[in-house]
């Protein structure tokens, strides 16, 4: 199993599956593997999302898949029970964080204030979700928060697309930008064009690498 933190540092991208028909979820996940980034967050925003995650975990064992938009402890327990490798929260939920830690499951809580970051720091968390990134002040806010929390790394999300995600990664405190643009561009997922999903992803990863080379 890959180390999520390591691959995020390399690619800077965190694919998020917001919605998929049951027969498209696993092929979409497989497309990420083919595109070279075997990580996927499945958002728990509809009734079939948990089943989609379960199907992905069973049918695409080479991907590291987890559950996002987890709001309750019961949801977290169910996701971990079916094999979720990580849990992503929109905000900070102490009971969920502690449950994940007790069950050796990576947890990425949402933190946009110093108070929330204090809680994350106390629990030994190294990566937090910063959502919604633009509405909460973007890079400027993250840089200010990084003063006292220099070791913390931020995964930014919120209406990101294939264009606006890239400038965010110029901030070294941002470990990755999360979004579903690789599924949405050219209506790839809607059209079940899984090869296009792979191409979209490879193109985004290449742009990140090119940007980083120019910075050196």
Residue ranges of predicted features:
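Conserved N-terminal beta1-alpha1 strand-loop-helix module at the mouth
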Residues: 1-82, 102, 190-214
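Active-site phosphate/pyrophosphate- and oxyanion-stabilizing loops and adjacent acidic/basic residues
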Residues: 54, 143, 166
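Glycine-rich beta-strand-to-loop/alpha-helix junction loops that act as flexible
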Residues: 67-68, 156-159, 177-180
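Catalytic beta/alpha-barrel core
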Residues: 16-18, 39-46, 63-71, 84-92, ...
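Catalytic cores of alpha/beta
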Residues: 72-82, 115-123, 140, 160-176
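Glycine-rich phosphate-binding active-site loops on the catalytic face of alpha/beta enzymes
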Residues: 90-96, 129-138, 173-194
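Structural motif corresponding to alpha-helix initiation and N-cap regions
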Residues: 1, 46, 50, 73, ...
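Glycine-enriched alpha-helix->loop->beta-strand junction motifs that scaffold or abut catalytic
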Residues: 33-38, 59-62, 80-87, 102-108, ...
